[in-house]
């Protein structure tokens, strides 16, 4: 008999992840109930009709009758109803924990405030280039449990802090916390609380890949890898060499690739490449395969993506910059001949925007702020304009553009105050860029 057969298991949250939990636990002959706090959740039409469903609130009675609760990453474990169930002895886990208990092949785990989707996809492409049967999922693409249906020799998972909160059995072959900057401060008590959730990725990991420029990424206590390697611009195992005006991606004394041969550009992307290379080498991927992937990888949509270029003006969609750290990374080391027209705003999730002040208060940077926290952001720039919407901002700035200028959407905020997702925000920016120029 398997561990879940005839167990009473309540799944909280529908959508892709919740449905993957339903499918998996049905295959394990568990007795399932589903709760979603939304009145009309997405995925309701795909739920088998014989599965009991409660919507609109958390059903405390169902929770207390459960042997196990599989909680959506979108719901905090600190929620009173969940705490009541925990105190009654009910086990609370997430879909990643279910996956880790079932997976029999090595797992690469990637988390961080910024860059994790790029690094996850890079490691996936590196493994593919080496001929490895690899599955990618978690917080990107398909839910992790769906990967169990594929013929995989390796799993590469992007993991959020929310997912890691309820994961106990990861034991990654290689893991990294890319960086730690303020994000989701509406969910965590403080930065340290958020950091501790991230560090769980190192628990029982074979190799930890550390960012030598950010000591907050270093594991501690029980959350440490057995062996570590590091990446940074200088003084690390994986580093960036500058010689005769050219830059090279390095591992120790060996050249991985001249930066000019990589399709990704910008210092923050070079750090992403170094982290991905370290993870790939930790699981035995050879450098030739890594080089092949780096020469062909085109980057991800909405991540510092050139979406339009005309009359010497570049339009960059960095809508995935949903927190301050991501926008700081985009601005660091950015060279522009003319003016930078920076679009900022949305839902700041309680973040401290002051870190942006020094970067954006420069003669060549003009800020156009919009959305729920637009007024807060506008205060940090002496050259700022305030609008209700991004479209209004773009219509205003368009006539001022000159050759050599860049229009950059890197909002430092979530999108949900005005858009269905950061993708929708990026798509609107791209549409406006292409229509208005």
Swiss-Prot record:
Entry keyword annotation includes Cell wall biogenesis/degradation: yes
Single Gene Ontology BP annotation: cell wall organization
InterPro entries: Mur-like_cat_sf, Mur_ligase_C, Mur_ligase_C_dom_sf, Mur_ligase_cen, MurD
Record's catalysed reaction(s): UDP-N-acetyl-alpha-D-muramoyl-L-alanine + D-glutamate + ATP = UDP-N-acetyl-alpha-D-muramoyl-L-alanyl-D-glutamate + ADP + phosphate + H(+)
Keywords: ATP-binding, Cell cycle, Cell division, Cell shape, Cell wall biogenesis/degradation, Cytoplasm, Ligase, Nucleotide-binding, Peptidoglycan synthesis
The enzyme's E.C. designation: 6.3.2.9
Pfam families to which the protein is assigned, alphabetical: Mur_ligase_C, Mur_ligase_M, MurD-like_N
Chief subcellular location: cytoplasm
GO CC aspect terms: cytoplasm
Subcellular location: Cytoplasm
Name this protein carries in UniProt: UDP-N-acetylmuramoylalanine--D-glutamate ligase
Highest classification ranks of the organism: Bacteria, Pseudomonadati, Pseudomonadota, Gammaproteobacteria, Pasteurellales
Class of this enzyme: ligase
An example molecular function term from Gene Ontology annotations: ATP binding
Protein's pathway: Cell wall biogenesis; peptidoglycan biosynthesis
Recorded superkingdom: Bacteria
Organism encoding this protein: Haemophilus influenzae (strain ATCC 51907 / DSM 11121 / KW20 / Rd)
Role: Cell wall formation. Catalyzes the addition of glutamate to the nucleotide precursor UDP-N-acetylmuramoyl-L-alanine (UMA).
């Amino acid at each position: 008999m398997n561990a879940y057969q005839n167990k009473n298991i309540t799944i909280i949250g529908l959508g892709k992840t919740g449905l993957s939990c339903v499918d998996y636990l049905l295959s394990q002959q568990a007795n399932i109930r589903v709760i979603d706090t939304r009145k009309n959740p997405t995925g309701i039409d795909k739920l088998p009709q014989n599965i009991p469903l409660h919507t609109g609130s958390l059903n405390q009675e169902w929770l207390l009758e459960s042997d196990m609760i599989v909680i959506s990453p979108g719901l905090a474990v600190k929620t009173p109803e969940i705490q009541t169930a925990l105190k009654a002895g009910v086990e609370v886990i997430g879909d990643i924990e279910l996956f880790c208990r079932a997976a029999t092949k090595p797992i690469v785990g990637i988390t961080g405030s910024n860059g994790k989707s790029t690094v996850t996809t890079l490691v996936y492409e590196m493994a593919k280039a080496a001929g490895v049967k690899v599955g990618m999922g978690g917080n990107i693409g398909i839910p992790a449990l769906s990967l169990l249906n594929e013929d995989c020799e390796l799993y590469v998972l992007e993991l959020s802090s929310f997912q890691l909160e309820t994961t106990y059995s990861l034991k990654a072959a290689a893991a990294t916390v890319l960086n730690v900057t303020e994000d989701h401060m509406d969910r965590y008590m403080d930065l340290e609380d958020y950091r501790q959730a991230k560090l769980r990725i190192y628990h029982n990991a074979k190799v930890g890949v550390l960012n030598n420029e950010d000591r907050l990424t270093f594991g501690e206590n029980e959350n440490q890898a057995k062996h570590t390697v590091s990446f940074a611009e200088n003084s690390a195992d994986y580093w960036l060499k500058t010689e005769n005006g050219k830059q090279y991606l390095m591992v120790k004394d060996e050249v991985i690739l001249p930066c000019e041969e990589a399709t990704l550009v910008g210092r923050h992307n070079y750090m992403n490449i170094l982290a991905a290379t370290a993870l790939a080498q930790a699981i035995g991927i050879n450098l030739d395969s890594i080089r092949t992937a780096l020469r062909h990888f085109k980057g991800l949509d909405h991540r510092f993506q050139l979406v339009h270029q005309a009359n010497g003006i570049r339009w960059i969609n960095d809508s995935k910059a949903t927190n301050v750290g991501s926008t700081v990374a985009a601005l660091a080391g950015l060279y522009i001949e003319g003016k930078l027209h920076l679009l900022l705003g949305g839902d700041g999730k309680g973040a401290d925007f002051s870190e942006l002040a020094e970067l954006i208060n420069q003669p060549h940077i003009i800020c156009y702020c919009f959305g729920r926290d637009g007024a807060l952001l506008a205060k940090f720039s002496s050259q700022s304009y305030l609008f209700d919407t991004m479209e209004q901002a773009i219509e205003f700035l368009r006539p001022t553009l000159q050759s050599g200028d860049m229009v950059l959407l890197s909002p430092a905020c979530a999108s949900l105050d005005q858009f269905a997702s950061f993708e929708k925000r990026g798509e609107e920016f791209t549409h406006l860029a292409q229509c208005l120029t």
